């Protein structure tokens, strides 16, 4: 079974979850979300894809998961992202991590995150939809 942690299930996070639910692979999705509205929206989007899918659980905080996570997606605002990354690096065992949107709010946090990822021998993938800017 594939174990996945999604931190933040707002608009983009819930779309990631929809894509995961579409996969035919057996999976369990751990979802960290504090907003009631986002939780309801995420459940609706899950059920729109597969009304029988129940292999997910919501948390208010990053959970301690005793199994290795195959994938972590951090889809929050950039402000708390470094703190979230530090918590994940100290409490979770994982294979792959995706950072959504603008990674961090400034270059200092970006460089600190880069250093932490290197120290922990982890590679982060950045999903940034604005790949080209025309001036």
Regions found by a protein language model. Give the residues of each.
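Hydrophobic packing residues within well-ordered alpha-helices of enzyme cores
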Residues: 16, 20, 39-43, 84-88, ...
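A short helix->loop->beta-strand "cap" motif at the edges of active sites that frequently abuts
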Residues: 26-27, 92-96, 119-123
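Beta-loop-alpha module in the N-terminal Rossmann-like domain of NAD(P)-dependent dehydrogenases
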Residues: 53-116
């Amino acid at each position: 079974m594939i174990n996945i942690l999604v931190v933040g299930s707002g608009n983009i996070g819930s779309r990631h979850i929809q894509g995961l639910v579409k996969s035919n692979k057996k999976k369990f999705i751990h979802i960290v979300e504090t907003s009631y509205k986002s939780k309801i929206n995420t459940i609706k989007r899950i059920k729109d894809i597969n009304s029988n899918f129940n292999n997910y659980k919501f948390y208010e905080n990053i959970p301690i998961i005793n199994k290795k996570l195959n994938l972590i997606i951090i889809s929050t605002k950039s402000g708390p992202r470094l703190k979230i990354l530090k918590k994940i690096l100290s409490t979770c065992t994982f294979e792959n991590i995706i950072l959504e949107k603008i990674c961090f709010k400034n270059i200092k946090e970006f460089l600190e995150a880069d250093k932490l990822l290197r120290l922990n021998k982890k590679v982060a993938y950045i999903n940034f939809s604005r790949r080209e800017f025309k001036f």
